[in-house]
Every structure is written in structure tokens, then in C-alpha cells.
């Protein structure tokens, strides 16, 4: 998978003056993970990090190499499956919803308790990076994995278009977990089973949709309350 996607699943940044928080990561992997071997090294913590405490949920753990090998053994079998030419393989991916595509690890600036206002220290933190090429859970390249091998048909379900079709108060919120609630998906399955011609529209497509909208994403650290008001005093938050 990593060898087929254009964006790295993990990136790193450091401060102008070495923070000693991500410095070892940048030294070992550069600014991003670009290969499967680097990906494994990061998961195992080969840059030298130690396992965090139970309460430090914001820090990356070091995966068990034994369990990882078991997972690799499984994938060496299922990932190399090649369907017979008599079998029609179809992959349908949800598209248009903000989906986590990668994580950036960076040194977050924090104050130094009891050492004066000018003191600065750093804490390892991460921020998710989003893509619209997904259904809020699975990114399109993963949903279309079989096509990497050149033996599967690809289709897209524009969930953003589907969810915004109705009036504001009646809009839907279909995503990965309930993609089969989309009428076009059910009609598509029916047509495949009956060997009928496939019908495409603004929701079900045989080419990848193009995102032409500006998107606003806001990230904050808890505890915090977000509120928004319009000119009529309507409130959400």
C-alpha cells in the first residue's frame, strides 16, 4: 500500500533549533516515511524512543515485532491473491468526506513551569492530515487495492454529493459504516447481479470525482468549547 500512494502516511517536522523531541525521528527517517522498511522501523521505534506510560496516550508506542511478523505472514498470503480470469472483481470506494490520510509528528511548544516567562520546552505531539479521497474511515487507495494489481473494476460513490442533495434540515450523513444505505449503491449491486448496464450519475461514478470546494478544518486541544453564531443569532457548538 505504501508503495502505491503518493502521500506519506507519516511525516516529521522539527523546530529551527533541535527540539530533542522529533530530532531523532528526522535524523533516522528524514521528513517523511517513504518505504515499507522505514514504516516498520518507525512502528518498532528504531529511532530510539521508549514506550510511553499508560496515561501518555498522545505518544506512539512500539509495536510487538512478533505480532507484526504474524500479520505479515497473513498478508503475504491474502495480498498476493490473484482472482481467476473468470471472476469479475469490482471495488467501490466512498469519496468526498474528510478522511485521515496521514499523521504529522511535531514538537509542540510548552512553557517551563517555575523557570520564568522566557523558558520554552517542547512536547511530542501529532496532528492528523485529511484527504477528501475517502469515506471518513477508509481512503480510496485502500478501498481500490485490488486495482493496483490491474484486475479489478473501480467505481466511486460521491458521499458528499449524496449527503447534500436534500434541504439543509433533511441532509443525510452517510459514510463508511452505512454506505449501503445509499440508493445508488443498492441499484449498482442489483445491476451487477442481473448483468444489466450500469447507470452512473452525480453520486455513483466510473471516474474519480474532482474536489472543487474550499474546506475549513479547525483543530484544538481539549478542554475547550467551540461556538459559532450567524447574523440571525443562530448558534451551534
Please give the residue ranges for each predicted region:
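Extracellular glycoprotein-like low-complexity segments
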Residues: 200-237
Amino acid at each position: 500500500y505504501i508503495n502505491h500512494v503518493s502521500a506519506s502516511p507519516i511525516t516529521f517536522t522539527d523546530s529551527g533549533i533541535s527540539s530533542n523531541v522529533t530530532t531523532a525521528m528526522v535524523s533516522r527517517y528524514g521528513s517523511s516515511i517513504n518505504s515499507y522498511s522505514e514504516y516498520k522501523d518507525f512502528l518498532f521505534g528504531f529511532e530510539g524512543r521508549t514506550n510511553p506510560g499508560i496515561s501518555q496516550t498522545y505518544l506512539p508506542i512500539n509495536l510487538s515485532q512478533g505480532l507484526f511478523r504474524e500479520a505479515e505472514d497473513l498478508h503475504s498470503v491474502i495480498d498476493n491473491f490473484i482472482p481467476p480470469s473468470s471472476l469479475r472483481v469490482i471495488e467501490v470506494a466512498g469519496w468526498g468526506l474528510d478522511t485521515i490520510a496521514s499523521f504529522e509528528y511535531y514538537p509542540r511548544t510548552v512553557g517551563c513551569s517555575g523557570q520564568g516567562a522566557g523558558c520554552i520546552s517542547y512536547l511530542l505531539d501529532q496532528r492528523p492530515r485529511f484527504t477528501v479521497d475517502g469515506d471518513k474511515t477508509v481512503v480510496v487507495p485502500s478501498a481500490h487495492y485490488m486495482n493496483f494489481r490491474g484486475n479489478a473494476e473501480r467505481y466511486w460513490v460521491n458521499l458528499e454529493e449524496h449527503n447534500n442533495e436534500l434541504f439543509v434540515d433533511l441532509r443525510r450523513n452517510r459514510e463508511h459504516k452505512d454506505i449501503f444505505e445509499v440508493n445508488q449503491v443498492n441499484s449498482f449491486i442489483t445491476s451487477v447481479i442481473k448483468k444489466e448496464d450500469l447507470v452512473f450519475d452525480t453520486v455513483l461514478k466510473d471516474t474519480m470525482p474532482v474536489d472543487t470546494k474550499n474546506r475549513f478544518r479547525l483543530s484544538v486541544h481539549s478542554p475547550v468549547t467551540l461556538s459559532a453564531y450567524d447574523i440571525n443569532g443562530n448558534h451551534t457548538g
